[in-house]
């Protein structure tokens, strides 16, 4: 078994769309990013890549490569999974924590779990998504952006 941890953060900017966990969330702002800015899937991808000792999302999908401009993070996650499978691992379970003052994430968590389970080819019982605030402290508390942490367990296939 191998464990990986991932973290991502993006600042709000522009009109959107706001996509978190593969879900389009109604909100007046989007996140500034080279790809679609999905902090949840970016953190999760980093956790999975880290567990497999494959580097990180920036190494695999560099923001200097125009091929990834506006990229769908679900596609990036699936490509990372293919590379992990080539190393002989499968996903055991994943846990994602979204850190945002607004918008509220909890109503969207069930669909995020469905998306992640589908993309990783695992059961929903092996996917957890939760959200928290920083009690109005720091950049997320001031509503300047969204952060996310994720952990992943890989098992030898």
UniProtKB/Swiss-Prot annotation:
Pathway: Isoprenoid biosynthesis; isopentenyl diphosphate biosynthesis via DXP pathway; isopentenyl diphosphate from 1-deoxy-D-xylulose 5-phosphate: step 4/6
UniProt cross-references to CDD domains, sorted A to Z: MECDP_synthase
Site (Transition state stabilizer) location in chain: 34, 133
Assigned EC number: 4.6.1.12
Signal peptide stretch: none
UniProt-annotated binding residues for 4-CDP-2-C-methyl-D-erythritol 2-phosphate: 8-10, 34-35, 56-58, 61-65, 100-106, 132-135, 139, 142
Summary of subunit composition and partner proteins: Homotrimer.
Name under which the protein is recorded: 2-C-methyl-D-erythritol 2,4-cyclodiphosphate synthase
Species of provenance: Erwinia tasmaniensis (strain DSM 17950 / CFBP 7177 / CIP 109463 / NCPPB 4357 / Et1/99)
Gene: ispF
């Amino acid at each position: 078994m191998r464990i990986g941890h991932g973290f991502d953060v993006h600042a709000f900017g522009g009109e959107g769309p706001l996509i978190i966990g593969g879900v389009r969330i109604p909100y007046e702002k989007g996140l500034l990013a080279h790809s679609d800015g999905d902090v949840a899937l970016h953190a999760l991808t980093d956790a999975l890549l880290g567990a497999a000792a494959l580097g990180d999302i920036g190494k695999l999908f560099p923001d200097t490569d125009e091929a990834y401009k506006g990229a769908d993070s679900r596609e990036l996650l699936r490509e990372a999974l293919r590379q992990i499978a080539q190393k002989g691992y499968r996903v055991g379970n994943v846990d994602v924590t979204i850190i945002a003052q607004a918008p509220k994430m909890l109503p969207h968590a069930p669909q995020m779990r469905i998306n992640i389970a589908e993309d990783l080819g695992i059961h929903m019982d092996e996917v957890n998504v939760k959200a928290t605030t920083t009690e109005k402290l720091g950049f997320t508390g001031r509503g300047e952006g969204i952060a996310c942490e994720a952990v992943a367990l890989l098992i030898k296939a």
